[in-house]
Amino acid sequence: MPNDDNANMIKGEMSPNWNWTRPIAAPGHMAVDFEERIDFDRLRGYRVARTRWALQKSELGAVLCFDNNNIRYITGSVIGEWSRDKICRYALFTGNSEPYLWDFGSAATHHRLFSPWLDPDRCKAGMLGLRGSVAEEAGLFKQAAEEIKQLLQAEGVADMPLGVDICEPPMMFALQAVGLEIRDGQQTMLDARQIKSMDEIVLLNMSAAIVDGAYQGIAEALKPGVRENEMVALASKLLYESGSDDVEAINAVSGERCSPHPHNFTDRMYRPGDQAFFDVIQSYLGYRTCYYRTLNVGSSTPAQEDAYRRAREWIDVAIEMVRPGMTTDKIAAKWPKATEFGFANEMEAFGLQFGHGVGLALHERPIISRLVSFENPFEIEEGMVFALETYCPAADGNGAARIEEEVVVTPDGCRVITLFPAQELFIANRY
C-alpha cells in the first residue's frame, strides 16, 4: 500500500507517492505485521475530510444523512443489511466538528464501546418512524427535529440550509416546522464520494477478487439440469465464505429469459447450449461490485457468438476512451441507439449500455448513458472507479450477451479490476 497523505487527496488529487505502474493490491483479509494493507484510520480520515471539503464548497451548513452508505462514509459505522431499508439510523455532520450518530437502540452503546474514532458523547440512540410503522403522532419526528435544530444552533449553522439525502416525509415536515431550510444533500455527498482514496480502491479491488472466485465456482457448476436459483445459492455461499459482508443481489438469467433482460432469477433449468448471464452485486467491507459475465452451457451457436462479439466490441471501445478529462457524453455516443438492439427508446433500454460509479453504493458518479449523458455530460477524473456494461441479444432469439468491467481511472487511462475471463464467450463444461 502507498503512504497516502490525506491532505493531498481531499480535493480528489491522488497522492504523488502512489506508483501507478505497480498493480493495484488485493491483499488478504487479515491484519498482519509484515506488510501494509488497508489503513482504516487513514480511510476514515479521508472520507471525513472529503465530506468536509464537499460541504465547504456547497451552500449547506450541514448534512443530515439517513442513507446508510452516507452514514458509513461519514462515521465508519454499520449495523448490517437489515437496516438498509428501515430509514432508522441517521447522522449529522456540520463540517465544524465531528459527526453525530443516532443508531438503532443498543447499537449506540456498542459504538461507544467499540468505535473509538467516534466521540462517545455524539453516539446516541435514535428512533423515528420505521417507514411509517410508528405514526407521526408518536412525536418521535418532532423530538428529533428539535434536537437537530439545537445542535445546528450550537454549531453556528442553523441559519444555513440543511442538506438531507433521503428521509420519511414526516421527518421532512418536522425539520421544516422548526424553521430549517431543507435542500438536497445527496448531491453534496456524491461530490465527496466520487473520488476514491487508494485504500478505497484496494477495497474495491478485493471485492472484485471475491467475485472472480465466485465465477470460477459458477463455471464449474453450470451444467444441464441445474437451476438458476441453485446457481444463486451457490454463488452466495462462495461469496460469504470468501469474506463478503452483503450479497445484495445476484441476477441469473438464461435461455429465452435473456431477451429482454428481466433483472432477476427464477427456477428455470439450464439446458445444453443455453446462453446464461449473471450479475453479482455484493460488498466487501461495504465496497460493492456490479460484475456481469456471460457463460454458455456446454456449446454455443453462431448467433450467440456474434452477440457476444458485438457486446465485447462496445465495451472495449468504451474502456479505451476512459481517461482523465474525457466526458461521459463522448463515451455514450460510442454505444448503439436503443432502436439498434430491439428497444423503442432510450428509457426502455436504460441500464443495458451503461456506466455507473461504484463504491459504498452500487450507483455513484459518473452515470454514463445515452438517456442522460448528452444533456448532462460529466468529466472523468483520476481516482474514479466505475463499471461499464453492455448488452446484445442474439439474432435468433436464443440468448443474449451481457458483459461488465469495473475500471479504476489512472493518470493516463484506466485499469480493469474485474478479471474473470471475458474477452471471448466462455463455454462452461464444453462437450
Region locations from a protein language model:
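Active-site neighborhoods and metal-handling regions in enzymes and metal-associated proteins
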Residues: 1-431
